[in-house]
Amino acid sequence: MLKPIRFWVCLVLILGMPRVFFAQDKTPYRLVNPFIGTGNEGNCFPGAQAPFGMLSLSPNNTFDNYEDAASRPGYKYFRNEINGFGLTHYSGVGCHAMQDLQFMPVAGTLDKSPVNDKHAYVSRFSHEREKAMPGYYSVTLDDYHVDAKFAATVHAAIGEITYRGDQEAHLVFAPTNCANGIGDGELHIESTAMTVTGWVSTGGFCWRDPKDRPYRVFFVAKFNTKFSSYGVWKGKAKAEGASNVAGDDVGAYVSFGKLNGKAVKMKVAISYVSIDNARKNLQEEISCWEFEDVCRATKSQWERMLSRLTVEGGSESQRQAFYTAVYHNLLHPNVYSDVNGDYMGFDDKVHRVANGRKQYANFSLWDTYRTTATLQALIAPDEASDMAQSLLLDAEQGGAYPNWSMNNVEYGVMNGYSTFPFIANLYAFGARNFDLQATKEMMKRVSVKHIKCKGFHGWEHVEDYMAYGYVPVDRHGHGASMTLEYAIDDFSIAQICKAAGDEAAYNYYMNRSQSFEKLFDEETRLLRPRNADGSFLTPFAPNMEKGFNEGNAMQYFWSVPHNVDALTDFCGGKGAMEKRLDTFTSQVKCGWAPDVPYYWLGNEPCFGSVYVYNFLGKAWKSQRMVRNVLNRFNDTPNGLPGDDDAGAMSALYVFSAMGLYPYIPGIGGFVVTGPLFTKVQLQLKGGKTLTLIGENAGNDAPYIQRLQVDGRETTSTWLDWNKLKHGARLNFVMGKGPNKQWGATEKDAPPSYY
């Protein structure tokens, strides 16, 4: 588990260690590039964050147009101005979120109010004088002649801000300039203590009003330099010398006089419970003023996490893309409890986690159950176990499991009830230190009756689903995709029930998991939206979005990972299925493409479709397509083919590059396609290692020629995790041309469940 960075980060540097923190090596840490995914696609941010950290201090450089996709993460690489630094960010999501408690170093005259005005205090910057690494961010604000650098811990951060010019130096607090504005807040200046504290109430994910499903976040900021003056803004009105302000239109500033090259140090921490808890977080994690000590401590955390999954071979660009993808999967969910264990529950009451545990928040579950859950269970099993327990606590406090949550609020922006496959994948791949029996009982409770989570979402239309065996499209516009997601949910619940020894419930949910068959349309051989009277949606076309959430009938056709055999039979057999898949994968779409009947790499429902060839005896075609997928990623700001969605897209890259994909939710096992790298090593609990050797592996050698598992030849395209989890060695021989006999027999195919 992550350990808080205690007072020891302030000890004297070990003799012989170089003063320069950033050694020029090629370790996994050094190969992470946080700017990947900050361009036109990805929606990532480059700022400083510890693994799964509550606080993420990152620049914001987007402005007024909230409907503009560019504003979603708070940062876009192609912009050349910065308007502030926020203390919370949500990586890769498709709507505006967080960017809370913005502040901005300013030099000169404070002649404008920053309240609800992102243009008030802005500086140009250059990427040549901008640097980002895990836990660290720095930039030069050209217009203010300011050099700013920041390092983060789990709950806090330290900054060193050098004002090089001869103008008055200030730091402006502009909390209204977060993603969606604020509904309320307070700022307090304690001039004698050189401290600023406060809180804001905000929310409004996906362009909503900040008073819609709000949360509160508290902060404390300390400085090592006396204030020469200070004041607040209430709306447009500036009050010099005032130290308190409250409302939904607040701002504040502290000034340091003319510094002429002197650096001001700032320490800041947040809490979702109280200002007092923010103080405790700061004291526990950064009690000193030594910037480099904090850097080293957080770097050590990142190195420890990143070293659990390593690769050799490939190009440096490919290794950089790989380690950055792993990094993206260590950002969220976020630690939500304070250093004393306090957290704000889904019942809006303060709770305390059990000793040795942490509460987590920010679950983009519709996205992350497909890939991220498995990756986190493999490389961070302790943290992943706490995530599963956190979701159970959320359900106990909020009435039901959240489906898409931010902090202690359910936003429910996607269909399905993806908490179930997320938890089932965590369990299947080794994250098992949570209350399995209570989890099983909660899953059973919320899957037979519509119980909302904190007043929202829950298993929507579950009564219709149980009555009809599907969700009618004339009762819910996404009825078809809901049915497919619910079938996966049922299968996942079944696996948890099986693990908990509840055979009757296992059989019940396994039967329910075949609900996708109710959408079989003999006329089109597609999974077609259906009305409550049993009729199919008319008119209808394969690329029609009606009935489907972010996709269409052809893109969702493959969304039956637990029973591909039944889907194949319905399609007309393996030949017909292969022909359809050939057409579907003949075009690869990135970005936004829900209305085309082809493989859409840019969104999650299509992730697994390229692996279906393994069920058809055509493993070589999956191998070819996976390499095609990998080539759509790179190590530039535009290096992701779609929203990263809290790591889901990046995790797809990781598994594709490993040549192992967790295809069936809730089942511990991988579909095999062969590695991109000559060596992959996964460190397992107990000191064991899973090693993949890729002889001849490379970008031009996507095809498996042979595979040995612990020295034994196999042609199976499915590897059972139970046979790998205690350590194993996979020896692949890769080649430039396909071995069409490898993985071609019926016994070589992955399993189907019915």
Locate each region found by the language model.
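Bacterial Sec-dependent N-terminal signal peptides
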Residues: 1-25
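Short coil-to-beta strand junction motifs in C2/discoidin
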Residues: 675-677, 699-703
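Short aromatic-glycine motifs in intrinsically disordered, low-complexity regions
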Residues: 690-699
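Accessory carbohydrate-recognition regions in carbohydrate-active enzymes
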Residues: 24-421, 427-484, 492-518, 524-527, ...
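ATP-dependent phospho-/nucleotidyl transfer catalytic cores
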Residues: 489
